[in-house]
Amino acid sequence: KKKFKIKDGIEIKIKKNVPAGFGMGSSAASAAACAVGLNKLYNLKLTDAELVEFAGIGEKASAGTIHYDNVAASVLGGFVIVKTKPLQVVKIQPPNDLILCVAVPELKVPAKKTKVSRGAIPKKVSLSDMVKNISNASGIVAGFSQRNSELIGRSVQDVIVEPARKHMIPGFDKVKKNALAAGAYGVTISGAGPSVIAFTDKK
């Protein structure tokens, strides 16, 4: 309000179809909606980068932490790569045949689920595991660059965070095994979970 000299008070109600606490960026979606809505309401003429920055501030207010990757995707749509310090957002176009399937389990999400999920991540990792994850992340980017859905999906392999968190999702290993057997190229935890996301194509 101070930056833009807005004197009005405002009450915002958001109706969305993103369940809170299921690893799908619910708080980021709310923050992005507020940033985009206020930009239009007050004709602030913010750039995409500014919208992402302010949405990040909004998410910190609601969720306690900024997730620029989540708010950037919510503001810009599609897929993004985010660099920080300084903040830089790169939007990337997916292959036309890429399909993502999200399974949302009927679970009662515990209080402070994201904080608990973060606590499960190891503080130290082996060099070999780090190399594997960086290699797979590079494979995902290469898949987008080549518009190759299979390469993207087969590169969705996480040997650090997924093993540390999967015990919090009942039946995760069985769901992943069955999805891969059904033709998915890759399966992993969506965000901090407990939703599970599978990557495939129109074949």
What kind of region is each of these model predictions?
Residues V102-H167:
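Active-site rim beta-loop-alpha module in soluble metabolic enzymes
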Residues S26-D48, V75-G77:
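DPxDG-like acidic metal-binding loop motif
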Residues T84, P105, A198-K202:
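Short beta-strand-to-loop capping motifs
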Residues K16-G25, G58-I66, K123-S128:
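A short glycine/serine-rich beta->alpha loop
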Residues F144-K203:
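Glycine-rich, charge-dense phosphate/pyrophosphate-binding loop(s)
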Residues K1-V18, M168:
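Helix-rich "cap/lid" substructures immediately adjacent to catalytic or cofactor-binding pockets
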Residues K2-G9, L38-F54, P86-Q88, K203:
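Phosphate-handling active-site elements
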Residues D48-L98, V187-I189, G193, I197:
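Alpha/beta catalytic cores of group-transfer enzymes, especially the acyltransferase/condensing modules
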